[in-house]
Structures are given as C-alpha cells and as structure tokens.
Amino acid sequence: MDKREKVITKTVLIPDDIEAIKKLWFDYLVWGNNKMQELYGVHPHNPKEAVEQDVQEINKFQPPYGQIVLSIYEGKVCGLGSLKKINPEIGEIKRMFVDPTFRRIGAGQAILEGLLAEARKVGYKKVRLDSPKFMEAAHSLYRSFGFREIEAYPEMEIPTEFKDYLLFMELDLSYDNV
C-alpha cells in the first residue's frame, strides 16, 4: 500500500475535532504569515485573532452550505480544508493546509476531492479560492482539478492591500474537471 492509499478524509461536524481544526488553522496562518513576511515584507494576519474569529463563525463552514474536511494519515490529522458559501451558486475554499511534515503523500489531493464533492452536494455551480502566490505546489494541484486564474473577487476576506500577493482561482463545477 503506498502513502496515498493510507490517507483518509472525513467531514467534521462541530464540536468534533475542534482542537485539531484550531491547531491546523493556527499552524497554517503562522506558516503563511512567516512566508509572506520573508518574501514580501508583509504580515496579513494575527493568527490567534484570525483563528478565534473563524471559530466564532465556524457555522459558515458547516452544512447545509459548508463543510470542513480533515485528512488523516496513519491515525494523525495532517491537513484540512474548509468550504463556505459566497452565494447560492458559488462556494469558496478556505484554509486548505497540509502540515509540512505530511506533504507529498496525497493529503492535499484527498482534501480537495472531498471539498469538491461537498460543493457538488450543496449544488454550487462554481468554487473559488485565494492562495498566496508563493504556494506554487498548491496552484499546480488546483490546476490539475481544472481551476483557472481569475481576477480578485469582491467577496474575498483578505484586505485589499494584500491582494497583489495572492492568486485567485475558480472552478466551474458544471463540467467534470477531474
């Protein structure tokens, strides 16, 4: 059995796995902030405050219009991704992250497959996301699923002064892209 076959995913209903979710969200924001500071000299988030806000608003990542998908490898939660509603036809992927020690085992692909299945189940016609420009491996993964680059969209949560450091992508779910 190869590593990819050992990666499993599960959808989460809160409060299940809330501590793992908070830890991965925090780790993602710290890692992303450090890279943004190193590469661009900017620091877009206070990770602790951002996680606290996401936890307060966690219902947006829950059914019927959203979902959180965890990836698990050999019994350890190693990554996650979140889906939320922009409008009745468009969902947004947020906070997709795989712990660096678990990368290259298929966890990101498994999370994305799970999120897109959830988006189709909700009935979204499109899914959007934003991603820091330095996350080239993630962009390759998104493109392999059919995502295309788009302009910044008005519903993005990132302050506009940071949009130049981000890539915006969209997947049309009316086609079978995978």
Feature roles, as predicted:
Residues 4-7, 11-94, 99-100, 112-113, ...:
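Acetyl-CoA-dependent GNAT
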Residues 106, 123:
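Conserved G/P- and acidic residue-centered "switch" motifs that form tight phosphate/ATP-binding loops
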Residues 103, 120, 143:
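Short polybasic/polar patches that bind polyanions
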